[in-house]
A protein has these predicted regions:
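Compositionally biased terminal segments of proteins
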Residues: 1-145
Length: 145
């Protein structure tokens, strides 16, 4: 999915879930696409409120992963995770994503995982470098909301 596709899929997901947009926060590859760090992603990783996640656990397929938070396969292109409301978020073109600093922390964590596929680890390292530069720019210095 390119940026335009991410935006469309995000708004469709928000509508389907019936949630406020700021309660559906993209992370991982989709957030990197929205920030311009990469051109495309395979899917959306969306963090949602615990109640929405629990509902999805009963309606969809729950996948438990060691060393990574649980996820629900909501659709072929969308995985849901539990939203951490204490983490910083920003809105880019109407799409809520974790802030560059939060995404940087996530990428650092993922890159240290022993079972991380090599190709993803290489991409993580590139994005870590780009995010380290991005967090230094005034464009993303807003407080968490």
């Amino acid at each position: 999915m390119r940026k335009e596709d991410v935006i469309v899929q995000y708004h469709q997901l928000v509508s389907e879930l019936g949630e406020s947009a700021h309660h559906v926060v993209l992370s991982a590859g989709a957030a990197a696409v929205m920030m311009g760090l990469r051109d495309e992603t395979d899917d959306l990783d969306a963090d949602v409120l615990p109640g929405v996640f629990k509902w999805a656990c009963t309606a969809k397929k729950l996948i438990v992963e060691e060393n990574v938070n649980d996820r629900v396969t909501y659709s072929e292109k969308v995985d849901l995770h539990i939203l951490d409301e204490d983490r910083g978020v920003v809105c880019i073109e109407g799409v809520w994503v974790y802030s560059p600093r939060e995404l940087l922390n996530q990428k650092r964590h993922l890159s240290r995982m022993e079972n991380r596929p090599y190709g993803k680890m290489v991409r993580d390292q590139i994005e870590i470098t780009l995010l380290e530069e991005l967090v230094k720019t005034p464009k993303f210095t807003a407080r968490a909301v």
